[in-house]
Amino acid sequence: MVYSARRVGHSPESCRNVQISRKSEAWTHFSTNHFDLVCRAHAVQPVTALQNEYSLWTRGPETNGILDACEELGIGFVPYSPLGKGFLTGAMNKETKLGEGDFRKILPRFTPEALEKNQALVDLLKRIAGEKKATPAQIALAWLLAQKPWIVPIPGTTKLHRLEENLGAAEVELTAHDLAEIQRAAAAITVEGERYPAHLLATTGR
């Protein structure tokens, strides 16, 4: 798999590199935040999947046209950081000390102040998790899986027990009532802090 995490250029010609080589079975994906670019790219060469950040605390794809484009064009969507870079697991709070070299140290959402204010979102996940006999991480992933059948989150981990926990999310059933409750409660929570510092955010197309 060849994948570019950076924003792609705005011309259809620049999208000709977004190709599938069936003979070599090499898949090329790209990520973007632009509905019109997705449609134009798809017209030049059918797009297989888009990857973008999406989770309960990063919901841009719902409003920037990306999910609409995927549904209209039959494109798969692969959310990265579906657990909010670890925050939505419930394992962090304002007292959490990130180690040297931890990329999250430069992220506005991981300041102690932001972690404290965003705790309301984790509390919501913990409450639903208690009702479902699951973990906050499993609820966060189950919520994503329940959005659309063509959404496939990719939580990263280096620990076997976390992998098993993540896989368990597929067994969590969220009813329409559960999803409506999560939506209502999450809508009342204002997420504190941008995803990235300004200089990095500018490269994502938001």
Model region roles, listed by residue range:
Residues 1, 5-184, 189, 199-206:
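Beta/alpha (TIM)-barrel catalytic core signal, keyed to glycine-rich beta->alpha loops juxtaposed to Asp/Glu
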Residues 194-198:
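Conserved PLP cofactor-binding pocket of PLP-dependent enzymes
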